[in-house]
Each structure stands twice: as structure tokens, then as C-alpha cells.
Amino acid sequence: MKLVSFFVLLLPAAWMVSPPSHTGLCGVDVVKAYSQNILGQNVGYYINLKNNSSKTVDAVSWTANFYNNFEDLKGKKTGKWESGNFTSVAEPGESMTDLEGAWIDGATKVFIKVTRVHFTDGSSCGK
């Protein structure tokens, strides 16, 4: 009887799976991300991040999780944004944008999880 009660209590938890969403880290938040589809093929994605921290950001890395309309995971890719010769650092309150190639079959949506942030003072968080 205890075993049956245990499974009955766990059953509602199986339906409580939250839908995919964007995840920021250390004050760097995902403002928007969407996949670029051409003739039914996912060719890449656009990402817009915002530096809501009190420090200046010079690099961000993330994992892009690709889903279809049924929220089935179709694939994962890593991406990164870095300041350099043509790209300025992101001061507090500023945004960062990037466009990445992907080529994930059947993907219609992309959700971003920021995995690492590097600041100009040499500190970082994540991995």
C-alpha cells in the first residue's frame, strides 16, 4: 500500500515540468532570442543580451537549446560574444547582440542559458 501511495504522490510531479525558458547569469540577462528559419530549415539564431550587473562585461558564453513546436529538444549548440577590435565592451545597462549559425533540423525555437560571464576587471562567474 505504501508503494502505491508513493507513486500516486509522484504522479502530479511528472506534469509539473516547466516549459523551456531563457536563463541569465551574474547580471547578464537574455532579452530576446529567436531562430532564423528559411524554407523550414533552421539556419541560425539571433540573441540580445543586457548587462544588468554593476561591472563592465567583455565576454559571455552560452548554450543554445533548440526545440520544435511540441517542445521536443532537437539539439544544442554553444555560442559566445566577445569584445574586440570592432565590438566595444558592454558597460552596465548596455546591450550585446549576436547572430550565430546553427543548422538544427526541425527546430523552430531557441532558448538560451548563459554559462559564463567575464568582466573587464578580470573576474568571471560560471564554469
Regions found by a protein language model. Name each.
Residues 42-46, 94-97:
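Intrinsic-disorder/low-complexity, polar/charged segments enriched in Ser/Thr/Lys/Arg/Asp/Glu/Gln
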Residues 3-14:
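Sec-dependent N-terminal signal peptides
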Residues 61-65:
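Beta-strand signatures of extracellular beta-sandwich domains
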Residues 48-54:
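Asparagine-centered strand-capping/turn motif at beta-strand->loop junctions
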Residues 73-126:
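Short, solvent-exposed, Trp/other aromatic-anchored flexible loops in extracytoplasmic proteins
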Residues 15-44, 124-127:
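Transition segment at domain starts
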Residues 41-43, 58-60, 108:
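Residues at beta-strand starts and edge strands
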Residues 55-59, 73-74:
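Short acidic/proline- and small/hydrophobic-mixed sequence motifs that coincide with surface turns
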